[in-house]
């Protein structure tokens, strides 16, 4: 049962964390370009 619970926790976690990192890096890239 624990093996079935782990993916259900990790999938949404990765699905939220990965886009968050991508958005943050993109935002910082745009901010750096605007300043320069």
Curated annotation (Swiss-Prot):
Belongs to the PsaI family. InterPro entries: PSI_PsaI, PSI_PsaI_sf. Signal peptide: none annotated. Keywords: Chloroplast, Membrane, Photosynthesis, Photosystem I, Plastid, Thylakoid, Transmembrane, Transmembrane helix. The chain crosses the membrane at residues 10-30. NCBIfam families: PS_I_psaI (TIGR03052). This is Photosystem I reaction center subunit VIII. The gene is psaI. PANTHER family: PHOTOSYSTEM I REACTION CENTER SUBUNIT VIII, PTHR35775. One of its GO terms (cellular component) is chloroplast thylakoid membrane. PSI consists of a core antenna complex that captures photons, and an electron transfer chain that converts photonic excitation into a charge separation. The eukaryotic PSI reaction center is composed of at least 11 subunits. Only detected in green leaves and not etioplasts; PSI is only assembled in green leaves. Coiled coil: none annotated. GO terms for biological process: photosynthesis. May help in the organization of the PsaL subunit. It is found in: Plastid, Chloroplast thylakoid membrane.
């Amino acid at each position: 049962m624990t093996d079935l619970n782990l993916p259900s926790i990790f999938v949404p976690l990765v699905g939220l964390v990965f886009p968050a990192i991508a958005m943050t890096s993109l935002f910082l890239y745009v901010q750096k370009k605007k300043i320069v």
